[in-house]
Amino acid sequence: MKIKTLFLKNIKKYKKFLKREKDSIRYSSGIVVLKKGEEVGEHKTDNVEEIIVVLEGEATIFVEGKKYKKLKSPSVVYIPPNVVHNVVNNSSKVLKYIYITSKLQWMCGCVNG
């Protein structure tokens, strides 16, 4: 593993930054750019925690199919493991956010596969 850098300019839609077990021991991350009306799509992160950092615009977070919260930049939200969620851009401006996911670990500090 080595130090990596990602410049956040000129990203059109999606750019993976860290791939778990390749670039990092337990983290995965990237940047997402959504235009008005676009969404990531409902998904569940299973045994993974997720942090979403809103850099620009507004994100509407849906949890289990219901509107949870509208976040304006700069904002951060934590999504626990095994939660079905979606990120939607309902504003007229572009939404840019960084996501960071981390696999759960046992108390002993061993990576939970």
Each model region followed by its residue ranges:
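A short, N-terminal "cap"/entry segment at the start of jelly-roll beta-barrel domains
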Residues: 1-28, 41, 109-113
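Conserved short histidine dyad/triad with adjacent acidic residue
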Residues: 30-46
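Short, surface-exposed secondary-structure edge patches
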Residues: 31, 51, 67-69
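Short beta-strand segments in beta-sandwich/barrel cores
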Residues: 38-41, 57-62
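Glycine- and acidic-residue-biased ligand/ion/polar-headgroup-sensing regions
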Residues: 47-49, 53-59
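Short acidic-glycine-tyrosine-enriched beta hairpin
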Residues: 66-81
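Ligand-binding loop in jelly-roll beta-barrel domains
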Residues: 81-106
